[in-house]
Amino acid sequence: MADAYTPRFRKLYDETIVKAMTEKFGYKNHMEVPKITKIVLNMGVGEATQDKKKVEQAALEMTKIAGQKAVITKAKKSIAQFKLREGMPIGAKVTLRRERMYEFLDRFVTIALPRVRDFRGLNPKSFDGRGNYATGLKEQLIFPEISYDSVDKIRGMDVIVATTAKTDDEARELLRLFGFPFPADNEDQKQAA
């Protein structure tokens, strides 16, 4: 029987990241080492109140990007100022876990982020205090699955990475070892001067 397929970033985690994190933080057990539990992609579509097809197009793009069917999100309550009624479709989201999560992470770090215009690294302060990281993207065209001709409107999206890390420092180190391009601390001090 052939060996089961293991994503490249899963192998990276098992073979190198666990050792590096154990050395740096002094974990006594390899099960203490933080890991990524899920990645949530979320795209809000503001124009959806006028045109329902915009949400379907956004969900189709999210499905292509994630490799998993997107769920259309609906408004929880009515807001008159936005002409929004409870239950109206207003966006799309995808929750990735296990192999698909590692595959997306690989494509996000190695292919998509380098294609962002004027990219100077991810914001190292976007952690929530519990070891989770959130970042926003201004356009969906940075993913190779989306062709420029098929896009009706450039939309941004949120990428949320949930980890089992107890502190932001542990999560920052985990994501840095996965290849997330955080600017170095000494560069931040140079810019402040």
Curated annotation (Swiss-Prot):
- Keywords associated with the record: Ribonucleoprotein, Ribosomal protein, RNA-binding, rRNA-binding, tRNA-binding
Coiled-coil segments on the chain, per record? none
Q: Which GO terms describe its biological process?
A: translation
The yes or no answer to whether the keyword Ribosomal protein is present is yes
Disulphide bridges in this chain? none
Query: Which molecular function GO terms apply here?
Result: rRNA binding; structural constituent of ribosome; tRNA binding
Concerning Gene3D superfamilies, the annotation shows: 3.30.1440.10
Is Zinc given among the entry's keywords? no
Record-level GO cellular component terms: ribonucleoprotein complex; ribosome
Q: Fetch the InterPro entries from UniProt.
A: Ribosomal_uL5, Ribosomal_uL5_bac-type, Ribosomal_uL5_C, Ribosomal_uL5_CS, Ribosomal_uL5_dom_sf, Ribosomal_uL5_N
- What PROSITE patterns does this protein map onto? RIBOSOMAL_L5
Subunit organization = Part of the 50S ribosomal subunit; part of the 5S rRNA/L5/L18/L25 subcomplex. Contacts the 5S rRNA and the P site tRNA. Forms a bridge to the 30S subunit in the 70S ribosome.
PANTHER family (UniProt xref): 60S RIBOSOMAL PROTEIN L11-RELATED
State the protein's name: Large ribosomal subunit protein uL5
**Highest classification ranks of the organism:** Bacteria, Pseudomonadati, Pseudomonadota, Alphaproteobacteria, Sphingomonadales
